[in-house]
Amino acid sequence: MTAPRLKITYATLRADNEELHALYEAGLEKAKGRLGAYHRNFIDGADRDGDGTFEVRSPIDTDILVGTFAKGTRADVGDAIAAARRAQPAWFRLGWEKRLEILKAAAELISARQMEYGGLMAIEVGKTRMEALGEVEEAADLIRYYAKTAEDNAFYDHPMDNLGDAAVHTRSILRPHGVFAVISPFNFPMALAVGPTCAAMMAGNTVILKPASASAMTAIAILEAYRDAGVPDGVFNLVMGPGATVGAELQENRGIDGIVFTGSYEVGFDIFRNFSTRYPRPCIVEMGGKNPAIVLRSADLEEAAEGVMRASFGFSGQKCSANSRVYVERPVHDEFVRVLVEKTEQLAVGDPLPRPAFLGPVIDQVAVDRHQQAVAEARRDGTVFTGGERLTDGALARGFYVEPTVVGLPPSHRLFQDELFAPFVAVAAVDSLDEAIALANDNLYGLTAGVYSEDPAEVQQFLEEIHAGVLYVNRRAGATTGAWPGVQAFGGWKGSGSTGKSGLSMYYVAQFLREQSHTVVD
């Protein structure tokens, strides 16, 4: 009997399965064999060159050429929209059962290619093996979970009342909008592209994906899975290229019926304000976070420090859910900082492809500069407890490596307000849970938050009063990070999200649909 495949999630704390590592090493070698190739856009079932090309180089070592990619144009986007509009009626008429069958086949292909795709992602954006493998697993599980939620809801087709008249037949049916644009980020290049594209297609829409240029290779892997699973021509289209042209055309073209964007608040809110022109159109934007953890005097400080460390420094802090600010009750502040610093200084930082690394590089020089500027401000205005340096020894000089950094600052400091997307966490002492919650809520964002307390009343107050969409209590695997499809819904409040509904949840697919009432009289 074959042993079940080990499931890797973001909450997986152990990485000592030797068979897993052997499989990953083989997949990584396969991924390395794909480096340096040229990849085209994909429109209406055909590969297409662009207006020149762009290169993607690994943040691990910029001597590594991940690939060369066709640079899409506004005209390419227009052709992709036209193809998607032509394909949409037949894709809808195919029926939801067949659509789900095709997309679930794509999930199986992603799982079967987990080691290779995880290796590609690790090289392309600098994830450690466990982070990369977890994300590939998440992408496949997103398809499976969204399919299950649709099936459990009879694909949103429900009879309504007839007020006692047997001749009247009424139904509520959810129908697709048409064509969706998906603009995905570099930091979760597979999960945050597969999630919205699969949900849109399940709903009967067709899709144009524009990935972050830094993660174009992962988008090619997604294309392979959809194409090999049998997604028809024109239903899924891929246009790579700059946000100023490809992204702008997707936002401005009236042939787009809905848009999904994951990225910065500035860009996301600009899309939200300007996307609807003649009439409202669905605009699903996830715009990051400045996520707080609260550590109270009753907390297990070992557990709290572990959770904060993992949430602050996993994928070098480049998660919208990363823990970047911590409010600690004053009596335990110094001890908590001591334990957190001790754990942080034990982390292995370096090339993420070998097994020992916990932190790899940040994505580019801009991220290095942002980290270094924050460190300079912390040195000027507070205390740098540990870290803060750029790492340039040997081969690290060819990548973008910085030390995980823990600082102490006044809670009014701008580094408690602004999202950094770097391995940097600020800690401040507070006098009460009331003060901690007030400070936590006094922020533009409202994505995730965590608390550590052994007092049930404190936990309940936190759950009732915190203004964020994803809450964690006493979580060693991550104070503010690690949501999983069907386990934790993931969506932001305030400046972190636009719809009030979350990804990874039972409500997600319905956001790609619109309600229609049918009344038929015999």
Question: Positions of the model-derived regions?
Answer:
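Hydrophobic face of amphipathic alpha-helices that form TPR/SEL1-like repeat modules
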Residues: 1-66
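Residue-level signal for inorganic ion chemistry
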Residues: 45, 63, 84, 99, ...
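Glycine-rich loop-to-alpha-helix module at the N-terminal edge of alpha/beta enzyme cores
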Residues: 57, 62-157
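Structural signal for hydrophobic packing residues in well-ordered secondary-structure cores
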Residues: 88, 92, 107-114, 118, ...
